């Protein structure tokens, strides 16, 4: 997909971004990429999408130097998904977003020194020694703005009021299915606010890639989400192939697509099974694990792996499909189709499932787009965001 590339100055940035959102209906902020552009300075690339016609554009702007800091106006008032995206850029690149109410680090510790995706970042072990103490924690957020004279000001906001009831979930908790900490403000059964603490398993993959060749980076994509290893590697080899002008045969395209879909089924079965287990439906969990084994068997015959496959290569595949792959994939589809009704019988249509899930945390289409909630949740709200169509 070729993007319409737009360059904006610091002075025009806030006004023109509002026009893109309100007048040209670029209502979905796909991502924000913080970048060190060398002599140009630090800056960001914003990928925007018009959800009515799926048109995309990229907006590039260079941060302004103010009192020794690099600053860009926040877009959180236009797209709510900018909240965590801007905090990520601040954490790794060091750009301060003016008007953002919570400019704290998101992934790295609060006492981490420097911003690792800058080209001048000190990589020596002495700069950031392995910490032997708990992470310092503040009860305040930080907001940056410019005063009437153009100088940078800092305002602190309290995270919690005296009346807030705060429940700390994680970083190790059976309900999170991963290392994640959530400071949760609740009122009875209603969650009023969540402050996420991420990065407990952050491995610095993007920084590692700066010193690698393209083929060396492939294995790391599989580990971004090992339940979507095929798709993540597919995304990386795809952009490399496009940049190099490599044309793929239809056979390779079909094989990659089928492998992606098989792993998507594998991932969904694990999700459904774990959700059922969390609600106490152990039978549904075992059914999902039983059927997931059949999917993994088909992929293993060709790739040799059941979790991390290492199958896609730049320009092609590790090897051709197993002679039995086509027949076994057809058998798998025939086997799985009637199982959908079985999942509904034992779990989906169960009154306990409905009581626990229906009406809990609903989001309409507008909010899904505003917060960047894609996938099944976004589609369920009426947002047609499936890129396969």
Where in this protein do the model-derived segments appear?
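Terminal low-complexity/charged segments
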Residues: 1-190, 267, 352-359
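Active-site bordering "gate/hinge" segments
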Residues: 110, 148-177, 185-389
């Amino acid at each position: 997909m070729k993007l319409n590339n737009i360059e904006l100055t610091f002075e025009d940035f806030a006004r023109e971004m509002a026009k893109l959102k309100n007048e040209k209906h670029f209502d979905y902020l796909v991502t924000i990429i913080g970048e060190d552009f060398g002599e140009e300075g630090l800056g960001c690339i914003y990928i925007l999408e018009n959800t009515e016609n799926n048109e995309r554009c990229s907006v590039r702007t260079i941060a302004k130097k103010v009192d020794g800091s690099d600053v860009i106006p926040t877009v959180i008032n236009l797209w709510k998904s900018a909240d965590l995206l801007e905090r990520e850029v601040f954490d790794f690149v060091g750009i301060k977003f003016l008007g953002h109410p919570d400019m704290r680090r998101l992934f790295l510790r609060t006492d981490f020194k420097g911003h690792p995706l800058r080209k001048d970042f000190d990589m020596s072990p002495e700069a950031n020694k392995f910490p032997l103490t708990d992470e310092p924690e503040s009860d305040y957020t930080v907001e940056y703005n410019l005063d009437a004279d153009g100088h940078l000001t800092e305002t602190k906001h309290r995270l919690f009021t005296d009346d807030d009831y705060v429940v700390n979930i994680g970083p190790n908790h059976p309900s999170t299915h991963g290392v994640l900490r959530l400071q949760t403000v609740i009122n009875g059964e209603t969650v009023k606010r969540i402050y996420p603490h991420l990065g407990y398993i952050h491995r610095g993959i993007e920084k590692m890639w700066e010193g690698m060749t393209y083929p060396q980076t492939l294995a790391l994509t599989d580990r971004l989400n090992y339940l979507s290893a095929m798709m993540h590697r597919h995304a990386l080899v795809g952009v490399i192939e496009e940049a190099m002008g490599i044309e793929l045969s239809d056979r390779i395209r079909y094989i990659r697509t089928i492998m992606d879909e098989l792993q998507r089924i594998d991932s969904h079965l694990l999700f459904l099974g774990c959700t059922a287990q969390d609600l106490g439906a152990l039978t549904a969990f075992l059914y999902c694990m039983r059927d997931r084994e059949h999917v993994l068997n088909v992929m293993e015959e060709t790739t040799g792996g059941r979790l991390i496959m290492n199958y896609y290569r730049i320009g092609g595949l590790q090897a051709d499909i197993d002679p039995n792959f086509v027949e076994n994939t057809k058998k798998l589809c025939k086997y799985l189709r009637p199982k959908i009704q079985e999942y509904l019988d034992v779990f989906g249509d169960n009154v306990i499932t409905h009581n626990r899930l229906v009406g809990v945390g609903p989001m309409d289409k507008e909010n899904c787009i505003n917060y960047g909630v894609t996938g099944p949740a976004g589609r369920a709200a009426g947002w047609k965001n499936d890129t396969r169509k």
